[in-house]
């Protein structure tokens, strides 16, 4: 039974029986679990089901209630395992389960496969009275997290910030932390509602229209508000600059990488195969190495640990700040954007305008799951002949050129193959995209 995808388990109308089985499987190897959840309407149901499975197997459970993923990851340090019930940016009918080690990192694919094997082999016997685990609540977890983050940031300037919580797990916590950091805060969509009545939890330009209007309106009088918007579990964020522009994920990541290198003299930065070449261009003058890894925060965290890098990030807004903790943290990332602005003594819009802009094109092509492996082999072989380049196969198939690159990669959650290109001019970008589409379509037909 394949349950885990690229970011834990994530399903429409997640069956509580699956959650029960996952809990029982976890109890085979872990005896102290902590559980958090986002605001989705099925959160209580899934929490109860997974708790029942854990207790049946003799695992003690600590319940945090509604908390962001970074709070859960931080709390996992005092337990054997952390369990976050969330579907992140997906619509309200979805829910999911994401697992964390007690160092704050997400479970690896190997760990997830081991759990799937246990689920396949388990008979889920009735509980025995003498091994059933205990349940407790921890009402101090959020305060411990807030105190820890505040002790690790240093912002002297009084910034004006609109914090958009998406009616999700960041509610109360993110606005509170920004306020305690000395900011003037206006919170938006900051009451918990698992129907996501204010906006859908994906923090993109389409969903942030009203928040952008609020930032623009506040800045008519020259007050220089920026916006920080979270997803469903607040492991990610995106910023809105003083001009009311939703910042490009790639450009914001490139700007922050430069800040980390300049401030700390870091020699290594970790990012993923789908991140912009602007990062290399931007860091070239500082001699910092850009290490690319597979897509997903677990791969970024692993590479950070392996290489000794102090920061790693994905162009989805998922950033990991090793000096503070290894769990992706959208609330901390928002605060560190303010640190960057203070360091340069510039408005966010000025910082963003300095980052190189390239042409980015994306296409997703329908492909049956059973054909994906065959198609990717075709893409690698024929792409090598077409582009006269060796393919990079770390995650999908990527071909890099002096003026751009193309990445062709099967989706881990949908029946699609995604094509992404980046280039310094539009003609080359369109050429790469058309070639990529042809490779995939021909691979399906072969």
Curated annotation (Swiss-Prot):
Phosphoserine modification sites are: 88
Known catalysed reaction(s)?
A: alpha-D-glucosamine 1-phosphate = D-glucosamine 6-phosphate
In its record, the post-translational modification comment is: Activated by phosphorylation.
Q: Out of the domains of life, which is the source?
A: Archaea
Which residues are involved in binding Mg(2+)?
88, 231, 233, 235
| Cofactor binding description | Binds 1 Mg(2+) ion per subunit.
User: Entry's CDD domains?
Assistant: PGM_like1
Q: A GO BP term, please?
A: carbohydrate metabolic process
InterPro entries, sorted: A-D-PHexomutase_a/b/a-I, A-D-PHexomutase_a/b/a-I/II/III, A-D-PHexomutase_a/b/a-II, A-D-PHexomutase_a/b/a-III, A-D-PHexomutase_C, A-D-PHexomutase_C_sf, A-D-PHexomutase_CS, Alpha-D-phosphohexomutase_SF
Active site per UniProt: 88 (phosphoserine intermediate)
Q: EC number(s) for this protein?
A: 5.4.2.10
Kindly list the GO molecular function terms attached to this UniProt entry. Answer: magnesium ion binding; phosphoglucosamine mutase activity
State if Lipid biosynthesis is listed as a keyword: no
* Gene3D superfamilies according to UniProt: Alpha-D-Glucose-1,6-Bisphosphate, subunit A, domain 3, Alpha-D-phosphohexomutase, C-terminal domain
Q: Which cofactor does it need?
A: Mg(2+)
Root EC class = isomerase
Record has S-adenosyl-L-methionine as a keyword: no
Provide this UniProt record's keywords sorted from A to Z: Isomerase, Magnesium, Metal-binding, Phosphoprotein
Instruction: State what this protein does.
Output: Catalyzes the conversion of glucosamine-6-phosphate to glucosamine-1-phosphate.
Q: Which family does it belong to?
A: Belongs to the phosphohexose mutase family.
Protein name per UniProt: Phosphoglucosamine mutase
Source organism (scientific name): Methanococcus vannielii (strain ATCC 35089 / DSM 1224 / JCM 13029 / OCM 148 / SB)
